[in-house]
């Protein structure tokens, strides 16, 4: 079917009376060089436009088995009709574009046999906004082939030269030099002289599917550099089931403004880089309306599908009046789905989210900590002037250590324009031990049978309460002030020690309930911080400069029963540096110290702590130590740490079949730690990942001595 469509599209060029093939008088390299030079100019040609977009989606089940009926339980997976072999959806939307990559698509009308929001969300609208002259797609999913910077990833062949209406054209085929989800294969036709692309076809791979898209550019001067017709094919294959989809799009431009090529005014506001807006489905079922406005006539098969759907609707309505069992079955399926997937609900101005009790994405694994399991719940109530109240609840369990963690955080976002918020948080944190305990064990009992490695981290269980306020003084500069209150309770289980003092004196006085009341101030500064707005809510995006964090805390003795008095100061610097295409380098440097310790204290740092359920950086693995023993996080009153991560789509796996098909990111890790006790601890790592999961292999070294090797995996939502 794909080949047939391609022939139909090319037919006007090869069937014209004045159309004939000829041998090109230009080398392929020259044609490519001129086309790529023109692409750099055409990429920045359009300043803005508005358009009406018609999209018709037809999906068909090619092959299925008994597992097919459970496909709808997988969220955001594949567009299909669980009750029929095929389905049709039609949409009309308004598309607005602003240079360089701001797309806002408002869906105005929807009709067809699948009209739920979850079905509309699976239509690949993002492929309609591909700029064939760009280096990458807007979401950086693919490297486009018509640029000098991406040419090193492709091989090109001049397939055909021909003339039509006294114009010469070149049909160029391209293939990737190795398999990778970031690379396409396909062809494009360029016009000699203007060197613009008149037709583009690309094919790509995903984990469970493959797809192709065809773009035909306009034939009027104002649309010569913009697509007017797009066809997208998708095929999903999983567990013996095969589903195919075809999406036809027609774009009718209303207004187009070209750029004046003047120096743009600098702005850090990058709101709405790409957004499809569909708060509720604007269902419009008037047959006469669609017959009048539909730019692409329905095919016979599509007419049959729609007529069958209308007949089924009548039958269902009759059944509903006489039997409620059908509704009960659907309710049971709905409940089962919510058990295994991340789900969200909306009621008036309130939104709820739940991770799903049996959701496999809530599982994690590391060779040191074993299997971890977590649950998340969220609630947000919208108020006037874009204000809101958010509640996030978290619970996690580590099976190997039999430890339970919780957190309940409530935030009142009272000034969204200035990131003003007040937050209250409480929960159960990492088990820990006090400085008094460590000092006495290490300094006084070292010769009596207890070594540092014998300490059990279950001596103190940490219950924390945190109240703080955050406010933006100016763009990129945030101030946070608050109070940390900890209650640390020991299990008073002295037998957990592997030995006692020689004279049998108990050391129970080292245990009990300890409290700390610590006001703190935190300053976060990012120079030239880019941001965007969603309504009145300001959201930080990126910056070309590092982010600096400074935090100072002082624990006050005898306030709310506090037994500690100390000062803590920490400095943290982090940055993500993008270079090349989809390559990045991230670093994170931190230093901290407890000073003026006048009493017993717990060496719990903010930026150097055990994260049992990591969500650092973009991969869930980097930015922390993956193999470091948790006993060493609290073993010193100071630390100096550094982490770096290099990410690229092409490192080691690019020439390995199968693996390179699904792993579109590779990462190298290096972490270094220095404390007065550890001196030098290092971790080296290598990781792979995609949008579903990330996994890494790490090796640990103490000074120059190899310690251990381990793995860690994190799943993406």
Q: Where are each of the predicted segments found?
A:
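Bacterial N-terminal signal peptides
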Residues: 7-16
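Structured extracytoplasmic
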Residues: 21-169, 177-183, 247-365, 456, ...
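Aromatic/His-enriched, Gly/Pro-containing loop or helix-boundary segments
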Residues: 22, 203, 215-218, 447-456
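Gly/Pro-enriched, hydrophobic low-complexity segments
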Residues: 143-145, 157-158, 167-275, 590
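Exposed, low-structure sequence patches enriched in small/polar residues
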Residues: 4, 137, 141-142, 274-717
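Short, flexible loop/turn elements at secondary-structure junctions
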Residues: 2-3, 55, 160, 174-178, ...
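Short, conserved secondary-structure transition motifs
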Residues: 55-63, 234-241, 254-264, 427-435, ...
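Flexible, membrane-facing loop/turn or short amphipathic-helix motifs
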Residues: 60-66, 202-206, 238-242, 362-365, ...
């Amino acid at each position: 079917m794909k080949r047939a469509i391609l022939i139909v599209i090319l037919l006007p060029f090869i069937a014209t009376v004045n159309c004939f093939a000829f041998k090109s008088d230009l080398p392929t390299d020259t044609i490519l060089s001129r086309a790529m030079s023109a692409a750099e100019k055409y990429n920045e040609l359009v300043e803005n436009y508005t358009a009406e977009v018609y999209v018709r989606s037809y999906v068909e089940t090619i092959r299925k088995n008994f597992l097919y009926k459970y496909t709808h339980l997988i969220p955001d997976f594949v567009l299909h009709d669980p009750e029929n072999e095929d389905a049709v959806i039609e949409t009309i939307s308004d598309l607005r574009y602003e240079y360089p990559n701001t797309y806002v698509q408002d869906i105005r009308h929807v009709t067809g046999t699948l009209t739920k929001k979850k079905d509309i969300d699976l239509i690949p609208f993002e492929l309609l906004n591909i700029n064939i002259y760009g280096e990458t797609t807007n979401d950086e999913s693919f490297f486009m082939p018509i640029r000098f910077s991406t040419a090193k990833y492709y091989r090109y062949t001049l397939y055909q030269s021909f003339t039509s209406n006294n114009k010469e054209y070149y049909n160029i085929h391209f293939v990737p030099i190795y398999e990778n989800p970031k690379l396409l294969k396909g062809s494009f036709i360029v016009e000699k002289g203007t060197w613009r692309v008149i037709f583009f076809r690309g094919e790509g791979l995903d984990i469970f599917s493959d797809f192709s898209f065809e773009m035909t550019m306009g034939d009027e001067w104002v649309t010569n550099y913009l697509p007017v017709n797009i066809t997208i094919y998708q095929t999903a294959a999983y567990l013996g089931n095969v589903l195919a989809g075809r999406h036809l799009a027609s774009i009718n431009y209303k207004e187009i403004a070209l750029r004046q090529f003047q120096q743009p005014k600098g702005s850090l506001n990058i709101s709405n880089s790409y957004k499809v807006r569909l708060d509720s489905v604007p269902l419009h079922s008037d047959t006469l309306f669609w017959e009048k406005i539909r730019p692409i006539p329905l095919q016979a098969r599509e007419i049959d599908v729609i007529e069958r759907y209308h007949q089924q609707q009548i039958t269902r309505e009759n059944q509903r009046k006489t039997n409620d069992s059908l509704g009960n079955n659907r309710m049971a399926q709905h409940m089962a789905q919510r058990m295994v997937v991340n789900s969200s609900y909306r009621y008036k101005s309130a939104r709820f989210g739940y991770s799903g009790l049996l959701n496999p994405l809530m599982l994690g694994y590391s060779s040191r900590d074993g299997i971890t399991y977590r649950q998340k719940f969220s609630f947000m109530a919208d108020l006037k002037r874009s204000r809101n109240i958010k509640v996030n609840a978290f619970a996690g369990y580590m099976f190997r250590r039999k430890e339970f963690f919780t957190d309940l955080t409530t935030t009142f976002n009272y000034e969204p324009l200035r990131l003003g918020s007040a937050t209250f948080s409480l929960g159960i944190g990492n088990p820990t031990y006090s400085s008094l305990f460590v000092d006495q064990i290490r300094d006084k009992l070292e010769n009596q049978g207890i070594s540092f490695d014998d300490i059990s981290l279950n001596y103190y269980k940490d219950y924390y309460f945190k109240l703080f306020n955050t406010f933006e003084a100016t763009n990129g500069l945030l101030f946070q002030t608050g109070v940390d209150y900890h209650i640390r309770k020991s299990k008073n289980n002295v037998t957990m020690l592997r030995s006692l003092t020689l004279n049998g004196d108990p050391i129970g006085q080292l245990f009990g309930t300890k409290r700390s009341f610590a006001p703190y101030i935190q300053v976060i500064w990012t120079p030239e911080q880019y941001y965007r707005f969603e309504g009145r809510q300001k959201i930080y995006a990126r910056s070309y400069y590092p982010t600096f964090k400074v935090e100072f805390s002082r624990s006050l003795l005898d306030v709310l029963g506090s037994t500690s008095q100390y000062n803590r100061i920490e400095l943290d610097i982090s940055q993500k540096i993008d270079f090349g295409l989809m390559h990045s380098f991230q670093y994170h440097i931190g230093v901290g110290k407890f000073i003026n310790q006048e009493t017993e204290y717990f060496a719990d740092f903010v930026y150097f702590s055990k994260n049992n359920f990591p969500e650092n950086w973009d991969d869930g693995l980097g930015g922390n130590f993956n193999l470091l023993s948790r006993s060493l996080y609290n073993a010193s009153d100071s630390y100096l740490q550094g982490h770096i991560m290099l990410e690229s789509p092409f490192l080691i796996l690019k020439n390995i079949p199968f693996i390179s098909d699904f792993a579109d990111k590779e990462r190298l890790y290096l972490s270094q730690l220095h404390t007065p006790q550890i001196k030098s601890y290092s971790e080296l790592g290598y990781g792979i990942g995609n949008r579903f999961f990330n996994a890494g292999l790490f090796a640990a070294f103490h000074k120059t001595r190899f310690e251990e090797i381990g793995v860690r995996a994190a799943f993406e939502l």
